């Protein structure tokens, strides 16, 4: 199960990196708008990474925020892309929301397993 969670997280991260740095014409668009799309993508990334690496919560959060910052900076060299502080804040905060969601799910699963064994 751990391998599947990590593989899923890697695929999701790769998709977000491509959507962020790839040609703008290939970026998916939705009725959520730019901030909504960013929020959804990074909540899912945070959730996936948090489920894939549940024992290193603070390290995963710190690395996630740092890599999100790097991803935003890399847009300075991507044609047709732009780096914005607002995007970094939305992406970092929503990734952390996803990480908290993963921690809550882990806590609930542990409680459920504990009550099922009694």
What are these regions (language model features)?
Residues 1-88, 92, 96-118:
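Bulky hydrophobic segments
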């Amino acid at each position: 199960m751990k391998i599947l969670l990590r593989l899923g997280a890697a695929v999701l991260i790769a998709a977000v990196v491509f959507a962020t740095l790839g040609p703008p014409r290939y970026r998916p668009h939705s009725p959520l708008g730019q901030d909504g799309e960013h929020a959804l993508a990074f909540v899912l990334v945070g959730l996936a990474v948090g489920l894939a690496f549940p024992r290193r919560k603070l390290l995963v959060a710190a690395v996630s925020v740092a890599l999100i910052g790097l991803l935003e900076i890399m847009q300075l060299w991507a044609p047709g892309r732009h780096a914005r502080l607002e995007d970094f804040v939305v992406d970092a905060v929503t990734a952390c929301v996803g990480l908290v969601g993963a921690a809550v799910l882990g806590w609930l699963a542990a409680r459920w397993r504990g009550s099922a064994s009694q």
